[in-house]
Amino acid sequence: MPFRDAEYSAIAKMPISGLVRIGWLGLEGDAVADRVHHGGWDKAIHLYPQDHYPFWRERKPGHALLDQAGAFGENIASSGLTESEICIGDRFTLGSAVLEVSHGRQPCWKLDHRFGAKDVMATIVKTARCGIYFRVAQEGEADASVDTHMALIDRPQPEWPVARVFRLLIGGGHKGDPAAVRELAAMPLLAEAWRERAAKLAG
């Protein structure tokens, strides 16, 4: 999808069916246009909770993008798994693959552009409805044609839900809890980019 000034984005995702290969860098056939800011080991899979869609429909009534999953560029559309309930380092099975939570998604201007609005990115920052990135801990396959269940198999850091980390590192909360930010800077299970961000915020 072409964006401004000849930039390209692969944010536009469509529902798929059938058996899908899940490799180290994501779903087989998934396009990543901006490899500097998207994709890679820590951003292999993006989940955006379907639980948030009613919130967005209230704010963007009649917007066609919200008629189906994929509006936020997510690879996985889930219900019952939100940023407040999923923690850094959580491991889930998806088909025969194992996914590990690496960090939340830091929103960028492309979401505003996609929705034709100026407030989507700011609303995500304010509400922590950011979505979740996973790294692939074990390659495998999942059948997108059926209601595939993501099963939690490990939770090493229950005190670190994605929403809390997002508010500290992206939402401005670092000013009120510098000790937590220093802890994040040294957290091996947190994505490298967010560890680096935490280190800068900690000074």
Describe each PLM feature range.
Residues M1-D112, D119, D154-G203:
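Electropositive, beta-rich accessory/interaction domains or terminal extensions
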Residues A71-L81, I124-R135:
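Short, structured beta-strand/loop micro-motifs enriched in basic residues and often containing a Trp
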Residues S84, E139-A142:
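Residue "hotspots" at secondary-structure boundaries inside conserved domains
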Residues G89, E141-T148:
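Loop/turn positions that initiate beta-strands
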Residues R114-K126:
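Short beta-strand-turn/beta-hairpin segments enriched in glycine/proline and small hydrophobics
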Residues T148-D154:
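Short hydrophobic beta/alpha edge segments that flank linear recognition/processing sites
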